[in-house]
């Protein structure tokens, strides 16, 4: 395994695979904060060159956290299909990138090949891709999942309706749900971030969400994004169950910082299969985001792109209905400006799809970042072009509870009309019965929540 290269007469020597992976990243503030970023553009190019010549086996055999020390590493490594891996283990990362992007490589070819990839390999491919490569490659890798709606079908673009309220006021939550539905939002999930994380409040909010779903016979699923153990307890006590949510991290230490163990995720999957009101096979929902491991002091000297890819390796094990990166939510300490946020969003979507998960993105930023709503609009259009499964939707894109800026209900409608995309088929049929949509386009009734009263 070669760990050095020469560029313009200068020799660049790297100590191990972890350092090569880190220094091959495009510039981002989180890697600088962690002390793992390339010192110059020249060193970055050198690292990319070295990484491109490494084999799949080189990367797999050198995970950024040792197998013996980390349950996430063990899960990712143990899930590898050895037949798929043995076919590609001697390929260089450059050859794997070319294979993914080749017109001769089919959806089924990638579906088999991805079974042989560890998360570090997935990250390695993303690091030697341009933004256009990430978009083109993502488009080639549809991932379709079924709950009560079917998400990820090529030609569709879905939306999580996010009716958050600073007091968990159920009237406010219901009003936002009606407004979102009137714009055609909500086919991914109607998902509320609660202020208060207890069983009683969770049940009250779930009852509100499912009160609307049941009253209008809406083919979708609800979720209240409390801690996974709170959701499990509420569902076991009789609360209506849709998707079960948890934020995840790419290391065992990071999971512990979130108060999560793999056994909890195993239990969530079992409870969902037994109790939840889901027609399909997929009942879990995970959120991630570059920088989360570093913020928890749980990155073990690895860069944030590689740690994010490990989130997707963990998620893949549980076959979730939804996974999304909350790309700019963690703040400018990790993704400083619109350039870094856009790059991260494209990387995350590509890595999620190459990992085989139903990948969406919360196109967002915090109020102290060097970004604005144009960032969100740029990123959502790029991601929709890349085949992203879903984005978020809330009134005017302003989350007054979580205090960050995301995409609005009308943004999903804009993307669908701009790129000739549709909601999930079950949801579109319901929108047509309500007079909100006809022939794939919103009607004059759209955007008026009074149609529900």
Curated annotation (Swiss-Prot):
Pathway: Amine and polyamine degradation; ethanolamine degradation. Its EC number is 4.3.1.7. Adenosylcob(III)alamin binds at residues 194, 246, 295, 401. Its main location: other. It is an enzyme of class 4 (lyase). GO terms for biological process: amino acid metabolic process; ethanolamine catabolic process. It is found in: Bacterial microcompartment. Its cofactor is adenosylcob(III)alamin. The keyword Aminoacyl-tRNA synthetase does not apply. GO terms for cellular component: cytosol; ethanolamine ammonia-lyase complex; ethanolamine degradation polyhedral organelle. Binds between the large and small subunits. Signal peptide: none annotated. It holds the Pfam family EutB. Substrate binds at residues 160-162, 193, 287, 362. GO terms for molecular function: cobalamin binding; ethanolamine ammonia-lyase activity. Keywords: Bacterial microcompartment, Cobalamin, Cobalt, Lyase, Virulence. It catalyses: ethanolamine = acetaldehyde + NH4(+). Disruption phenotype: No aerobic growth on ethanolamine (EA) supplemented with cobalamin (vitamin B12). No phenotype during growth in vitro. Decreased expression of eutR during bacterial growth in vitro. About 10-fold outcompeted by wild-type in mouse intestine at 2 and 4 days following oral infection, but no effect seen during growth in peritoneal exudate macrophages. A non-polar deletion mutant does not grow on EA between pH 5.5 and pH 8.5, stops acetaldehyde release on EA plus vitamin B12. A deletion allows growth on acetate, suggesting BMC assembly or maintenance is impaired. The keyword Lyase applies. Induction: Part of the 17-gene eut operon transcribed from a single promoter, induced by ethanolamine and adenosylcobalamin (AdoCbl, vitamin B12). Gene3D superfamilies: Aldolase class I, ethanolamine ammonia-lyase heavy chain domain like, lyase. Belongs to the EutB family. Catalyzes the deamination of various vicinal amino-alcohols to oxo compounds. It is spontaneously inactivated by its substrate and reactivated by EutA. May play a role in BMC assembly or maintenance. Expression of the eut operon allows this bacteria to use ethanolamine (EA) as a carbon, nitrogen and energy source. It relies on cobalamin (vitamin B12) both as a cofactor for the ethanolamine ammonia-lyase activity and to induce the operon. EA enhances bacterial survival in macrophages in a concentration-dependent manner, suggesting it is an important nutrient during infection. PANTHER family: ETHANOLAMINE AMMONIA-LYASE HEAVY CHAIN, ETHANOLAMINE AMMONIA-LYASE LARGE SUBUNIT. The basic unit is a heterodimer which dimerizes to form tetramers. The heterotetramers trimerize; 6 large subunits form a core ring with 6 small subunits projecting outwards. This is Ethanolamine ammonia-lyase large subunit. The gene is eutB.
């Amino acid at each position: 395994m070669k760990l050095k290269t020469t560029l313009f007469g200068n020799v660049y020597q790297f100590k191990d695979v972890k350092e090569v992976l880190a220094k091959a990243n495009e510039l981002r503030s989180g890697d600088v904060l962690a002390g793992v970023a390339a010192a110059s553009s020249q060193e970055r190019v050198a690292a990319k060159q070295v990484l491109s010549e490494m084999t799949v086996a080189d990367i797999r055999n050198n995970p950024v956290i040792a197998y013996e020390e980390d349950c996430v590493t063990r899960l990712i490594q143990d899930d590898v299909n050895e037949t798929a891996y043995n076919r590609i283990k001697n390929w260089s990362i450059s050859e794997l990138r070319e294979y993914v992007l080749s017109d001769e490589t089919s959806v089924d070819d990638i579906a088999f090949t991805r079974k042989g990839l560890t998360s570090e390999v997935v990250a390695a491919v993303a690091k030697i891709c341009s933004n256009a490569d990430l978009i083109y490659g993502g488009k080639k890798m549809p991932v379709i999942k079924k709950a009560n709606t079917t998400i990820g079908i090529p030609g569709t673009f879905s939306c999580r309706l996010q009716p958050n309220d600073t007091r968990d006021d159920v009237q406010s939550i219901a009003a936002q749900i009606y407004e979102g539905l009137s714009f055609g939002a909500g086919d991914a999930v109607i998902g509320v971030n609660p202020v208060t994380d207890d069983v009683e409040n969770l049940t009250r909010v779930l009852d509100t969400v499912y009160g609307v779903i049941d009253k209008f016979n809406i083919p979708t699923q609800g979720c209240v994004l409390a801690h996974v153990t709170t959701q499990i307890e509420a569902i076991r006590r009789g609360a209506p169950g849709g998707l079960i949510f948890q934020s995840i991290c790419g290391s065992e230490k990071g999971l512990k910082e979130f108060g999560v163990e793999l056994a909890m995720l195993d239990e969530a999957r079992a409870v969902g299969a037994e109790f939840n009101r889901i027609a399909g096979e997929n009942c879990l929902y995970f959120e991630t985001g570059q920088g989360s491991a570093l913020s928890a002091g749980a990155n073990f000297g690895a860069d944030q792109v590689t740690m994010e890819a490990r989130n997707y390796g963990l998620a893949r094990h549980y076959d979730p209905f939804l996974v999304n990166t909350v790309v700019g939510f963690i703040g400018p300490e990790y993704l400083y400006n619109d350039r870094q946020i856009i790059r991260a969003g494209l990387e995350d979507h590509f890595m999620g799809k190459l990992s085989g998960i139903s990948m969406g993105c919360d196109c967002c930023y915090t109020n102290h970042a060097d970004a604005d709503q144009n960032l969100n609009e740029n990123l959502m259009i790029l991601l929709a072009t890349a085949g992203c499964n879903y984005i978020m939707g809330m009134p005017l894109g302003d989350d007054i509870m979580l205090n960050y800026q995301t995409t609005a209900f009308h943004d999903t409608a804009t993307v669908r009309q701009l790129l000739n995309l549709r909601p999930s088929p079950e949801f579109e049929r319901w929108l047509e019965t309500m007079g909100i949509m006809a022939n794939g386009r919103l009607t004059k009734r759209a955007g008026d929540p009074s149609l529900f009263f």
